[in-house]
Swiss-Prot record:
The keyword Oxidoreductase applies. It comes from Francisella philomiragia subsp. philomiragia (strain ATCC 25017 / CCUG 19701 / FSC 153 / O#319-036). The record marks D149 as: Important for catalytic activity for the proton relay mechanism but does not participate directly in the coordination of zinc atom. This is L-threonine 3-dehydrogenase. The gene is tdh. It comes from the Bacteria.
Length: 351
């Protein structure tokens, strides 16, 4: 079968035509891939950075954001049928640890990821445990369903705390941060401020409903950034601080600024992964009585339920998809993603 694979321990991802068909077992589902989306993780693997070098076995079929159709299933599978449109949870868990047995599978200590630790979705076919497969409602397109993984990250991050009537600060306007703007606006946030250095994505954030989108590339240090944020807060009528912070960047200065401008009793969801150690003002956390929650992946499957329910209720995520390409043009897709001048890039395997 055709697949995109990491074949060498160097930058790049390569198309192959002779990847072996995956074999499915008693509790597995065989999925014919229709659409995939390129994730930031895929860029790390493409670029072969330090994280990838330490994590990714080679050779490896990459990719974990997908939509497809069930074409076969094991004899023990009753939850889906051949012909069902599906996406799937890319985190595979042990099912036996304390958290898994308590229904908190997103906290499994032994989590592994498709396209990272085991063969992934950038292929014509994917095998996945039936328990990880999620049926796509008829009203949701394959394109949108292929972005369920990052959208689920945004849902999990944003809905960890109440947003209705709250002032929300989002640091990082990548695709997940942009989705968080949509979610916060849909949930009735009062003011939404987002920060980034990417002018293209900051304009997308404004189009998505952000009250203010701040270009932080203009500021030399965290003190200047905090001063500018306080000016923005004053201009939009904020007399205290932000009630909820959604940290999507993993950047030290962004996190420090967020702590500075949070209201007392504020709540922070932290999704962004840092390339190194982070230094923060511990006193600000203590004396402001802040609540911090680390986010990894999606709650299985409450996040998926909330996500599809909100889409069916009218939350419009279509604008997050800015480019659609045939799989044969995957190199162009990766170049577009690397440029940052995009939202989500979809690769079509069905034509």
């Amino acid at each position: 079968m055709k697949a995109l694979a990491k074949l060498k321990k160097e930058p790049g991802i390569w198309m192959i035509d002779d990847a072996p068909m995956p074999e499915y077992g008693y509790n597995d589902v065989l999925i014919k891939i229709k659409k995939t989306a390129i994730c930031g993780t895929d860029l790390h693997i493409y670029n072969w950075d330090k994280w990838s070098q330490a994590t990714i076995p080679v050779p490896m079929i990459t990719g974990h954001e997908f939509a497809g159709e069930v074409v076969a299933k094991g004899n023990g599978v009753t939850s889906v049928d051949v012909g069902d449109r599906v996406s799937g949870e890319g985190h595979l868990v042990c099912g036996q640890c304390r958290n898994c047995r308590a229904g908190k599978r997103h906290l499994c200590r032994k989590t592994i990821g498709i396209g990272v630790n085991v063969q992934g979705a950038f292929a014509e076919y994917l095998v996945m445990p039936a328990v990880n497969v999620f049926k796509i409602p008829d009203s949701i397109s394959d394109d949108i369903a292929s972005t369920f993984d990052p959208m689920g990250n945004a849902i999990h991050t944003a809905l960890s705390f109440n947003l209705t009537g709250e002032d929300v600060l989002i640091t990082g306007a990548g695709p997940i941060g942009l989705m968080a703007v949509k979610i916060a606006r849909f949930c009735g946030a009062r003011r939404i401020v987002i920060t980034d250095i990417n002018k293209y994505r900051l304009q997308m954030a404004r189009d998505f409903g952000a009250t203010v989108a701040v270009n932080v590339s203009e500021f030399q240090n965290q003190q200047q950034l905090t001063a500018q944020m306080r000016k923005v807060m004053s201009e939009i009528g904020m007399t205290e601080g932000f009630d909820v912070g959604l940290e999507m960047s993993g950047i030290n200065s962004a996190i420090s600024m967020m702590l500075d401008v949070m209201n007392h009793g504020g709540k922070l969801s932290l999704l962004g992964i840092s390339a190194g150690d982070i230094s923060v003002d511990w006193g600000a956390i203590l004396f402001k009585g802040l609540t911090l929650k680390g986010i990894y992946g999606r709650e299985m499957f409450e996040t998926w339920y909330l996500m599809t329910s909100m889409l069916q209720a009218g939350m419009d995520m279509e604008p997050i998809i800015t480019h659609r390409l045939h799989i044969d043009d995957y190199q162009k897709g990766f170049e577009i993603m690397k440029s940052g001048q995009c939202g989500k890039v979809i690769l079509d395997w069905s034509r």
